[in-house]
Structures are given as C-alpha cells and as structure tokens.
Amino acid sequence: MKVTYFLEVTSSWCFWSEPMWAELKARYAGRVAFDWEIAKMLPGDWPVSRAQCDWFYRRSGTIVRSPFMLNSGWFEPVKPGTYPAASYVAEAAKDFGFTGDEIRLALSHAGEREGQKIGRLEVAVAIAAQAGGKKLPAKKLRAAAESKAVAARIDASTQEFFAHQISQRPAFVLSDDIGDKAVFSGLVHLEPLTAAIDAMLADVAAYTSFKSHHGNPPAR
C-alpha cells in the first residue's frame, strides 16, 4: 500500500499537516510506502499582499488551534510566469538522495516560522544546503533546481494532482495493489486517513489470505 502526499512548500495548510504526516509514517512504518510530490499552486491561489497572507494565517492558525501565528515575512508578490523557488529546491534535493522530509521541512520552517524569503532561489538554496550538509552542495543544488528535468517532474506531479479532480493542498492519495484508491484533499486531521488506511490494509490482507487458499481465479 502507498500514500502519496501532494503539497506546496509555502502552503500554510501543508505546514499544519506535517505533524499528522509524521504520525502516519511512524504508525504505519514497514506496512505502507510513503512519498511526497509537489503540486504547484495556480496564480490565483497565492495571496496578493502580506496583509492578505496574514489574514489567511489567522484563519488557518485559529482553525488548528495553534499557539503561534505563522510569519508572512517570506511573502513577495508572485510575478507572472514565475514560481517561488522553495518547491523547486526541495524537489531538486531528491537528486542528491534527500527523498525524505528534512529539506522541505527546513524550507517551510525558515519561511513560515522565521519569515525568510524562501521564494528567492538563492535564499532557498542556502537554507537547503545548510540542512543537507556536505551531501547537498549549494552550487549543484541550484543547478538542479533550475534544470529542465526538475521542472518537468514538478509539472508532471502537478498534472497528476489535478487528474484526481482535486484543488486543495495538502492532498493524500491512498492506493493499494488490489486496485483500491482513496483521495483526501484539504484535510489535516489524522483520524480520516487512519480509518481509510486501516480498512485498505485489512482488505489487502484478506485478498492475500484468500489467494493462499484458492490461488488465482480460473482462466475461464
């Protein structure tokens, strides 16, 4: 069974979902494969001012009962035809073996807790390189983040996100090898996902048990 997490590094709702993501990975370690992919936000999804960004942060922070408010200091207007760098840098870090959460979490924390300008490539690269240490050299990371290969991967994962007929991040797509699929879009609470995962794991186990007793279906 696999769970794919679709995210945008600078999304406040993705920030709030991270404790739940970590809990899922710990709870189902060894039984479920976990992966994350970038789902780019559309131009109209971004706040148009720091004041508007703060308004969104007050709303999401209140809903999750956070004891702190996120920092909008990272905010800069998104120019037409451009995209904030943080997600590209996080994706590029995969080329250096950083397929876990550590690099994108470092970027998210730097932006949304410290207000660093993670939309700027040089800032995002510096943060990621520091988090990755010697295994993540800044010059090579920047080249990868600016490469056509990374852009193509992000475009492909974004298209996959929209192919599920969803629009809200975070999104979680649960799939298994018996063809079941469950899609959650915009949720940051643990219980709905654990209920679905438990049900799907039970079904997979049942199919395995049946096959061990009866084998494959008759050809005719």
Predicted regions and their residues:
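C-terminal cap of thioredoxin/glutaredoxin-like
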Residues: 6, 10, 18-26, 109-220
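Short, cysteine/histidine-rich loop/knuckle motifs that typically chelate Zn2+
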Residues: 13
